[in-house]
Amino acid sequence: MDQAQLDWWRSAVIYQIYPRSFADANGDGMGDLPGITSRLGSLKSLGIDAIWLSPFMRSPQKDAGYDVSDYCDVDPLFGTLDDFDKMLATAHSLGLRVLIDLVPNHTSDQHEWFKRAVAAGPGSPEREFYHFRDGDTPPNNWQSMFGGPAWTQLPDGQWYCHLFDSSQPDLNWENPKVQEAFEDILRFWLDRGVDGFRVDQPHAMGKAAGLPDHPDVERAGAGFIEGEPSPPMWFQESVHPIFRRWRAILDSYPGERAMCGEAYVLPLSFMALWVRPDEFHQTFNFRYLDSPWTAKDIRKTIDESFEAFGAVGAPSTWVLSNHDVMRHASRMGGDFGRTTASDGVGPNDPQPDAELGLKRAVAATLFTLEIGRASCRE
């Protein structure tokens, strides 16, 4: 295998597939894995190199599959493990690589780990899989990204932490048993032949020792803002050794397996620390997605991206859309900031200019492809 094949992820065009809405093979109104398999030839004809599958693992579906109840099985909504294997084999026969979503910050509250923790009671080893704390009130001032306190109390009086929905308890990544369990999950999918992982919210996995209050109560439930100190629930240094071990696992498999982190950290020089040679292969460059559609802003983002990622020998990714924001054909048809782009446009909101948005989206896509090629020539 030559170096270009080994470094495929540096220049690959990766197409995101949202399984529930992509293609329905059995007519039940829900997209599924056989539906994806049936469309792989069409995707190949677009000139893409790989697909990334949004969550398809077993889940109660309270958060579109980002609440996983079994990391080593397929949700019946989408098919079976056999369907996955057939899809993977078909993709590989067409020369397409397959990356899958991995959600390590939290599980579903229906995962066996959490159900065993609840049943075992306070002080048990099972509860060490998560962040449980005693108290009459929430253990700190952290707020959920979905609203309200980031803590929910059980009938036995203990509280558990969830940076997202209360049905998504956060795992305790200081626990070696959690780390070992996820290393086994990585191997399960790598053994099946997947080419890598898109890792969801890796910057949320570590928590500051002692789970201290956020210093700014007004910001205790918000994400990161450039220029602010790192909050105690995001961007902890303790996660980096975990990802180095994951990288070593991927590197132990034949061919080049890759992982891309959804690490929304700024400035770009900070984001680049996640793609040092022994950690993630890539991370999503959301600065490019957020950049206003002006030559000045786009050039500034590109220059800063080349500088930051080049300093650690990594390529930048160039992202225009994903499942969390409006598609760029709509977004570029109006003056939409990131908040609107994430929340969408309602029927009573100012509507995008469809013709303008499509023209800009085509231009942006062609421009992005050329940036990718230029990155590989650097």
Where are the regions a protein language model picked out?
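Active-site and adjacent substrate-binding regions of carbohydrate-active enzymes
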Residues: M1-E378
